[in-house]
Amino acid sequence: MSTASAASSSSSSSAGEMIEAPSQVLNFEEIDYKEIEVEEVVGRGAFGVVCKAKWRAKDVAIKQIESESERKAFIVELRQLSRVNHPNIVKLYGACLNPVCLVMEYAEGGSLYNVLHGAEPLPYYTAAHAMSWCLQCSQGVAYLHSMQPKALIHRDLKPPNLLLVAGGTVLKICDFGTACDIQTHMTNNKGSAAWMAPEVFEGSNYSEKCDVFSWGIILWEVITRRKPFDEIGGPAFRIMWAVHNGTRPPLIKNLPKPIESLMTRCWSKDPSQRPSMEEIVKIMTHLMRYFPGADEPLQYPCQYSDEGQSNSATSTGSFMDIASTNTSNKSDTNMEQVPATNDTIKRLESKLLKNQAKQQSESGRLSLGASRGSSVESLPPTSEGKRMSADMSEIEARIAATTAYSKPKRGHRKTASFGNILDVPEIVISGNGQPRRRSIQDLTVTGTEPGQVSSRSSSPSVRMITTSGPTSEKPTRSHPWTPDDSTDTNGSDNSIPMAYLTLDHQLQPLAPCPNSKESMAVFEQHCKMAQEYMKVQTEIALLLQRKQELVAELDQDEKDQQNTSRLVQEHKKLLDENKSLSTYYQQCKKQLEVIRSQQQKRQGTS
């Protein structure tokens, strides 16, 4: 065995040769397995089992092969890791020869996949975190692509192969076991199909641009917090067939154009149309200026506290900051159109938002709890979306201008009333006859302005009017008023029916002068008008409530129709796919028959 030959053409060397004399071929430290104290199994890699262990008083990850069939992947990863040295690539400490295993840097944060889609509780993360992860991934891959004398292609980029350290702020690429055995490993790997470039599974010649395609899918995934092509389901070949036919993840609502353009370029069917990883690094580095806070550690729901609400908004992404330092004057019931001043994680489940809206703090911050909403505009209505997808709705404006959008919004006329982010506010007539914007769920009819609350009146709600209206409590007097009815023994005014005391202060009938017939007539007319006014307001409130019920029913009907239409389209699509596959099968069958006949002819002539 020639060491020089093995070093110059390591890819052609046998696995046995390289294991027998790795110190002569590869640049790594040989570690005595007795120095390692294995603690627990933490997962699987491209080959073998990954365990957490202690080595020389520090945490390490050891990757052991389980069978001889994994030995080649082990050699590939050992060879590739011994070549690289980059802050965004997992570090190789050394290898053991008996038993065969790699000793690598331990990532306490686990994989990016588990952070995005793992078991509850899931951490909150901001758009800054999402962009930073993608930037670091691109930096690591760009380093691999720039290696000399021959570029190294990862070929299996996906969140399970991206590890997080330093509180989730630093990303490291791992699993190089597929770097030279793409056909035997990846085409049979269901877990990689969603991120795989079409030219890889099509059997075409591929270059480092296949990593660019995978990176574009990862960018979509960290922004939406959804699994790519999850709605397709079935075996891996269904995803491959869809990607082959041009299917890509749905575009993201409110995603800034520079990010969308970069992402869709990475998805291009033609590898030559995709940007290089070096170009991606330049673009992402430029865009990161608009995403501060990426160095803040990830926060989990159990770490959340009300006391730290105002300080954790920008670092944890646990709520949308409506009244932040730059937009303290912004407050509108239609919050869909209010750009947030920090990069938070937006949870869009409307029912949860409605419950949260009732628990607003007086500081003006709207706390959004974790939900399972999706930021993808064109996803099926019945799909179970992932949690806390990155809110990109206001980044485009910040990219276009370095100063944040600060146009004043119309505020509420009632303090501590915020409306609902996803609901269109209703115009409700207040007691003084002026329109007032309220959220749909808040069906209060009127209310005095702050500072106008009197000892006799308060802001009544529909419920108060319904249960204490003029027809059920004290109706307007129809008989002539007499001085005997004007006051009780304590001198309090009993001339005004109690129902009218729920009216706004300036609308309540005033006690008449008992010695003036004109005053008495005005008072009685005022009482009748007040009664009619209350009836109309009550009817308006009830009609509004009924309207909301009808709107809800209509929405449900539309959802049912959409579901039916979606199922019909999906059925048609499956039929077309079945027909296409059948045609393809027949073509392959004919080709096979032709090949067999040609072989038979050759055998006959020979």
From Swiss-Prot:
Activity regulation details: Activated by pro-inflammatory cytokines and in response to physical and chemical stresses, including osmotic stress, oxidative stress, arsenic and ultraviolet light irradiation. Activated by 'Lys-63'-linked polyubiquitination and by autophosphorylation. Association with TAB1/MAP3K7IP1 and TAB2/MAP3K7IP2 promotes activation through autophosphorylation, whereas PPM1B/PP2CB, PP2A and PPP6C dephosphorylation leads to inactivation. Ceramides are also able to activate MAP3K7/TAK1.
Bias type Polar residues, positions: 306-338, 443-452, 464-473
Effect in UniProt of substituting residue 158 to R: Abolishes ubiquitination
Modified residues (Phosphothreonine): 184, 187
UniProt KW Transferase keyword: yes
EC numbers for this chain: 2.7.11.25
Signal peptide stretch: none
Active site per database record: 156 (proton acceptor)
CDD domains attached to this UniProt entry: STKc_TAK1
Modified residues ((Microbial infection) O-acetylthreonine): 184, 187, 341, 444, 446, 448, 467
Topology of this chain in the membrane: Peripheral membrane protein
Membrane-spanning ranges: none
GO MF: ATP binding; DNA-binding transcription factor binding; histone kinase activity; identical protein binding; linear polyubiquitin binding; magnesium ion binding; MAP kinase activity; MAP kinase kinase kinase activity
Binding-site residues, ATP: 42-50, 63
Stated consequence of mutating residue 63 to W: Loss of kinase activity. Loss of autophosphorylation
Compositional bias annotation for Low complexity: 361-375, 453-463
EC class name: transferase
Region (Interaction with MAPK8IP1): 1-300
Catalytic activity: L-seryl-[protein] + ATP = O-phospho-L-seryl-[protein] + ADP + H(+); L-threonyl-[protein] + ATP = O-phospho-L-threonyl-[protein] + ADP + H(+)
Effect of residue 410 to Q: Found in a consanguineous family with intellectual disability; uncertain significance
General function of this protein: Serine/threonine kinase which acts as an essential component of the MAP kinase signal transduction pathway. Plays an important role in the cascades of cellular responses evoked by changes in the environment. Mediates signal transduction of TRAF6, various cytokines including interleukin-1 (IL-1), transforming growth factor-beta (TGFB), TGFB-related factors like BMP2 and BMP4, toll-like receptors (TLR), tumor necrosis factor receptor CD40 and B-cell receptor (BCR).
Disease linkage: Frontometaphyseal dysplasia 2: A form of frontometaphyseal dysplasia, a progressive sclerosing skeletal dysplasia affecting the long bones and skull. Characteristic features include supraorbital hyperostosis, cranial hyperostosis, undermodeling of the small bones, flared metaphyses, and digital anomalies. Extra-skeletal manifestations include hearing loss, cardiac malformations, and stenosis, particularly of the upper airway and urinary tract. FMD2 inheritance is autosomal dominant. Cardiospondylocarpofacial syndrome: A syndrome characterized by growth retardation, dysmorphic facial features, brachydactyly with carpal-tarsal fusion and extensive posterior cervical vertebral synostosis, cardiac septal defects with valve dysplasia, and deafness with inner ear malformations. CSCF transmission pattern is consistent with autosomal dominant inheritance.
Similarity comment: Belongs to the protein kinase superfamily. STE Ser/Thr protein kinase family. MAP kinase kinase kinase subfamily.
Protein name: Mitogen-activated protein kinase kinase kinase 7
Protein's gene: MAP3K7
